[in-house]
Swiss-Prot record:
The lineage of its organism: Bacteria, Pseudomonadati, Pseudomonadota, Gammaproteobacteria, Aeromonadales. It comes from the Bacteria. Its EC number is 2.7.7.72, 3.1.3.-, 3.1.4.-. It comes from Aeromonas salmonicida (strain A449). The keyword ATP-binding applies. This is Multifunctional CCA protein. The gene is cca. Residues 228-329 form the HD domain. ATP binds at residues 8, 11, 91, 137, 140. Belongs to the tRNA nucleotidyltransferase/poly(A) polymerase family. Bacterial CCA-adding enzyme type 1 subfamily. CTP binds at residues 8, 11, 91, 137, 140. SUPFAM superfamilies: Nucleotidyltransferase, Poly A polymerase C-terminal region-like.
Length: 413
């Protein structure tokens, strides 16, 4: 019986990166032997065990045979006769198919170390094409290791394109797609994920709302990058810089979906695009079963981001309506997320990365002043019933007006 450290722990150590979970591979053992050594079995589809002391995962060496469509149609075969090379052959990328034995020796039958040195994401074997989920995984790895200079090998990208053209992505479950998307959005450079998917055609197959934005122009004065798809990925990058929160990053991704519906005759203007994008966002979220907090913020950002951008032009009564519509009184934390997404939208433009954008600060101060209006004073003044609500709105209006009078507005021209 031989035990090896495999997968991400070996890869990340060789890259000089912090190691995450330590997964182990056991060659030449049976289930009975593992149980006799005190391991507890947790795998249902194939034999995976937890170490009695460290609780790290140990899996018996296995092979996989495709039987059916999609990423779940596999039959696994684990036995003492399965070799290290056979087990590593079933893995997705060469950089994930390196093993380290108990003496610290590396076993690299498929050139993973060389690909680490060359910063290349390359598939291990043609069996890569049997699992459509690997298209998303490769794109996610490209995003994850972008800072280290990794790119997808041309032959792997070509295989991903063939898989996409064959309709393999249709066999992925919504939950699995969202799980990959969630991991990507919580990373450092999620825009790379979408760039890779676009290169292999998977963006159009999975996320047509986003793919439709590429090639759609916006006014050069406000969008020197011109292309709305490029702008969206720039906004996503800015959202990652501004906020670690999944909902903010997802809202940044969806905020301009409505521009994909603008008839070319009206380009580069996109009047009302925020409202036009709402049905697209709802459909996207329903399709992939996106969590409610992400969906709700994305809808708010799409609907209201243009209002925030022109906040200095809004009358206090209009700003009060924005607060009401966003339920800012009861959900101030979500409203702060809305402002972060608007900041990302403003700065996610060529040449606008460091420009002053004071509107969210003004809006936040106006909201704070309106929130500070004490209801108890209105009640103490003798107002009752509907009159309380009317008086509260009036005093909030006055509070916003005072903030507005105190601000020196910035001319962006």
């Amino acid at each position: 019986m031989q035990t090896y450290l495999v997968g991400g722990a070996v890869r990340d150590r060789l890259l000089g990166l912090p190691q995450g979970d330590r997964d182990h591979l056991v060659v030449g053992a049976t289930v009975e032997q593992m149980l006799a050594l005190g391991f507890s079995q947790v795998g249902r589809d194939f034999p995976v065990f937890l170490h009695p002391k460290t609780q790290q995962e140990y899996a018996l060496a296995r092979t996989e045979r495709k039987q059916g469509r999609g990423y779940t149609g596999f039959v696994c075969h684990a036995s003492p006769e399965v070799t290290l090379e056979q087990d590593l052959l079933r893995r997705d990328l060469t950089i994930n198919a390196i093993a380290e034995d108990e003496e610290g020796r590396l076993h690299d039958p498929y050139g993973g170390i060389q690909d680490l040195e060359q910063r290349m994401l390359r598939h291990v074997s043609p069996a890569f094409a049997e699992d459509p989920l690997r298209i998303l995984r490769v794109a996610r790895f490209a995003a994850r290791f972008h800072a280290q200079g990794f790119v997808v090998a041309p032959e792997t990208l070509a295989l991903m394109r063939e898989m996409t053209d064959a309709g393999e992505l249709a066999h992925l479950t919504p939950e699995r797609v969202w799980k990959e998307l969630e991991k990507v959005l919580l990373g450092q450079t999620p825009q790379v994920f979408f760039e890779v998917l676009r290169e292999c055609g998977a963006l159009k197959a999975l996320f047509p709302e986003l793919d439709a934005l590429f090639g759609v122009p916006a006014p050069a004065k406000w969008h020197p990058e011109i292309d709305t798809g490029i702008h969206t990925l720039m906004v996503l990058a800015q959202a990652c810089r501004l906020s670690p929160e999944l909902a903010v990053r997802f809202a940044a991704l969806c905020h301009d979906f409505g521009k994909g519906l603008t008839p070319p005759a009206f380009w580069p203007s996109h009047h009302g695009h925020g409202q036009k994008g709402l049905p697209l966002i709802r459909d996207f979220c329903e399709r992939f079963r996106v969590p409610n907090d992400c969906r709700d913020l994305a809808l708010l950002v799409s609907d209201l981001h243009t209002h925030i951008h022109i906040a200095f032009e809004l009358k206090p009564a209009t700003l009060l309506k924005v607060f009401d519509k966003a339920d800012a009184w009861r959900r101030p934390e979500r409203f702060a997320q809305l402002l972060d997404a608007c900041r990302a939208d403003f700065h996610g433009r060529t040449g606008f990365e460091e420009r002053v954008y004071a509107e969210p600060d003004y809006v936040a101060q106006a909201l704070g002043a309106a929130q500070a209006v004490p209801v108890k004073d209105i009640v103490a003044a003798g107002f009752k019933g509907e009159a309380i609500r009317e008086q509260l709105a009036k005093r909030r209006f006055d509070a916003i007006s005072r903030v507005r009078d105190e601000w020196t507005f910035i001319d962006e021209e």
